[in-house]
Amino acid sequence: LLGSTSICSKEWVWEQYDHMVMTDTLQSPGGDSAVVRIHGTKKGIAISTDSKPRYCIADPEEGGVQIVAETWRNLTAVGATPLAITDNLNFGNPEKKEIMGQFVCCIKGIKKACTKLKFPVVSGNVSFYNETNNLGILPTPVIGGIGILKDFRKHISYGFKESGDTIMILGTTKGHVGSSIYLKEIEKKEEGAPPKVDLDAEKQNGDFVRKLIEAGMITACHDISDGGVAVTVAEMTLSKKIGATITLPKKKNIPSYAWLFGEDQSRYIITTKNPAPILKKAKNKRIPLYVLGKTGGDM
């Protein structure tokens, strides 16, 4: 899965560009969001772009919801408060009813998520007639989001920081593998509905994570996306070459492959040196939080 085109490192692209102009870059490409500081202030800006054509072809409206939610989640994962988005809507020939249907439903999903998350669209553009030999591209709405950090020194990155930290998963895991990378790459199937986004849980979980980051209670944070829990943890280990040992919960209704590679939404992997107060806070707010394991070990 780590070698698939959707998940593999894109470093060969971004390393060719100067992403350290004026040395304001606090978090370089490869993480959940890029973070840059604002001169003369303590503020920072976080930026993220996201798209999921495979979700949008399976369910255009739910795909529209998901890409907005993931952009919101990526900004949250570095400690930023999401402010607004711009959209770039790429589709095939709108004279075909099915293509226009995809377009309309994606917009409905984007509107639904933006309204619930208070994440307004401030600009955007539309590109139609993207096709070759009468075959259109997958519905490809792209969302670019921006967020603000009141104090850039409190931003957080996704990589494990040191051995001995407790790894936790925040959010509800149901083992949804429909339209997942696992299904495509391992089972060689492209089918099933994409995971449904619970926007109430999305907002609650994200607001909680942001408060943990603001309070300095966690050492790393990464949203769970393509490839599920296993890929998310693997990416966190690769950042600083610090390993991890994890134990899956004993849930008879969720197969191990679905627990590891399912792409349920509204989830994060976080690490901390002191899990007890975080577990207590999560319990008080009825936010699902499970201790997954510990960092440590050579890569």
Label each region the model flagged.
Residues 209:
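Phosphate-interacting basic helix/loop segments used at nucleotide- and nucleic-acid interfaces
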Residues 26-28, 63-66, 147-150, 196-206, ...:
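A general structural motif
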Residues 59-62, 101, 193-203, 219-220, ...:
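A short glycine-/small-residue-rich loop at the edge of a beta-strand within enzyme catalytic domains
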Residues 152, 163, 180, 202-204, ...:
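In a subset of proteins, long, contiguous C-terminal domains/tails are tracked
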Residues 1, 106-109, 113, 117, ...:
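Glycine-/charge-enriched secondary-structure boundary and capping motifs
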Residues 2-175, 180-191:
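Glycine-rich phosphate/pyrophosphate-binding loop regions near the starts of catalytic domains
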